[in-house]
Amino acid sequence: RMAFNIVARNQDDHVKNIAFLMDKTGSWSLSPAFDMTYSYNPTGRWTGTHQMSLNGKRDDFTIDDFTACEKAIAMQRGRGLEIMQEVQDAVTQWPAFAAEAGVPAETADQITLVHRTGI
């Protein structure tokens, strides 16, 4: 979710948009994703920057930030980069998804311009 929020510019990525579920045995799991949508306005009070940080940063992310996160949470080496590539591959398909959903071409193009698919 973090990678998607950064690449697709969901800058409304605050803690109330991440939840957990507990099953009948008391085991916890991450809830299905929700409120994950494009929300970027460079002059907006809440959407001008990410609400959550990655490697102490809220903008100008690099692949090194994802690698640092991978290490910090003891993720299998290289898995963070795999996730990042999967997310970037999915987000580059945005124009096709937007067209299928009937998003006006001008709007879809404006959103495409600010996606971070080159990290």
List each language-model region with its residue ranges:
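Anionic ligand-binding catalytic core segments
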Residues: R1-I119
